[in-house]
């Protein structure tokens, strides 16, 4: 029998269940904990293999040759997607902007650090219309330079080169972003089921922008920031100003940076709405096979940039859309504007009685002048008093505007690349910027053994040492590479006052550790971590194992002047399942909050499991509570948490919200108490499988070794200087 013998239309694959998405476990059981977020981006997904190191590969790139090729690309118009005014700069800026602009400060997720705009949902967001064309224009360059340049780097570089090619002196650029190879599973983009659903669905009160659901930073599903036509598509520049301010603040931009990015972003390029958006094909992810990843196909394009339809808004913002100049301010403030409609029916603003010489030329016919436009967000720059004042300052000093924009653009495109020690390439700026969370280099030459001896003799308890080290390190976020133990910012505002850090206990511990650091030449950051290591070693010894926790000296101590306190507020833990604590009751379940923290820390499922079990038996719960401390040998690094969790002689009885008793199944006597963050390791089938491994009789030593490895991973998560 061969394939020709198959009956037509009868599938040779049973049910298609392997290759076509069926009903997933989370669809059958929506309350199931989604542990997949801990195992995304596995090396098995990457075509480059587990031994490939992009950050090493990019260092061998011919940077100048690449930049020349990208400059040439800007004016090499292609028939299949003609360049506006013969220049792709505006398109490439939008690609870079929308790649980086999905970043949000609240959890550090989104952003351009992974090349995620290549995949769903971002590749098919309404606001990202026709950016598939921009990526295809970059393909010949990516093909030429291969694995020496990632898509993530190339996409963001394209915007910077575009600005350079149009006359802006940029602030710099760093390489070093590694591509992912599948869509992210950990990013919450919103609960809406429809693209561009009304803003009301993510606000408690849409008239109060600060009531937008956290961690979101865009006003509607499928937008990067705000609706350019106005709040819910209804023009009101002052309401738009309020939404612009909130959305940009949620990605760590102040008013001046926001105004600079808005005005500078619209100094070049144009919007596209010269046609019927209803005739466009589906976006890339939902389009036909033969379109080969292209979406928003326009049957009326006919090789003419003039007929393109993207946002539905039509026109350029300035007289010279391929030139970095002050034309945006000249038109916005030099004319009165009135509300009108684009050919696609979108709301936009047009100037009243504009002079012909101030009108931009047609994108494909330089002999023809056409009307410029402004969006509601642009009118907000004029009508909002604070933004207006900033614009007046820019208008009075072009050099100041250009420098402010260049720095804001650099921040936008590098916000999630991490500290300056990670920067790569000849154009990486050497200046320390406060939003990079700078940390001075620490000493590596002190006597580590002597420091550990002083800590051991200090009188601090095991719990105090381990808890303080954990609290210092747990702020790390793999999403934007912020936080962590390096810098010892736990001793500075705002961290020293966070409820999750137990300020009274923290100050007691610091009052002991800081003199040790001063006396030995070690940094406070190193001493805090060493204290945690001493505690872990003591706990292991109490369990019968002599181990040495790995340690690399060299952490530095940041100062208050190096710390943007407001920006660090977003790193405050409102829950920490590893220390069995929540600041208050939340709609989100404790186990989901635990999972989120584990993902941000870069932990796998087994690492999360072994860390929590070890933290429990060492008695490190917030406030000294006994929930989840399933042992009578507190302070010994035993596998008792898992042994008792999986012991069928025990019964689990709910005693109120997020409170459980562990009772003897026969007598009913209460043996332990627990929270959901404890019992999920026996309830969830995957976590129970991990727990059973660590509960086995032969797992005592493995448990200790695995705990130490996971502990060290967290302590060193921000040691980019060791890479």
Swiss-Prot record:
TM region positions: none
Cross-link (Tryptophyl-tyrosyl-methioninium (Tyr-Met) (with W-97)): 225-251
Active site residues per record: 98 (proton acceptor)
Chain residue numbers at which the record places covalent cross-link Tryptophyl-tyrosyl-methioninium (Trp-Tyr) (with M-251): 97-225
Catalytic activity line of the entry: H2O2 + AH2 = A + 2 H2O; 2 H2O2 = O2 + 2 H2O
Pfam families named in the record: peroxidase
PTM per Swiss-Prot/TrEMBL: Formation of the three residue Trp-Tyr-Met cross-link is important for the catalase, but not the peroxidase activity of the enzyme.
Keyword Metal-binding: yes
Cofactor binding comment, as recorded: Binds 1 heme b (iron(II)-protoporphyrin IX) group per dimer.
CDD domains: catalase_peroxidase_1, catalase_peroxidase_2
Binding site for heme b: 266
Signal peptide residue numbers: 1-29
Required co-factors: heme b
Annotated function: Bifunctional enzyme with both catalase and broad-spectrum peroxidase activity.
Subunit (UniProt): Homodimer or homotetramer.
Entry-linked HAMAP family: Catal_peroxid
UniProt record similarity statement: Belongs to the peroxidase family. Peroxidase/catalase subfamily.
Protein name as annotated: Catalase-peroxidase
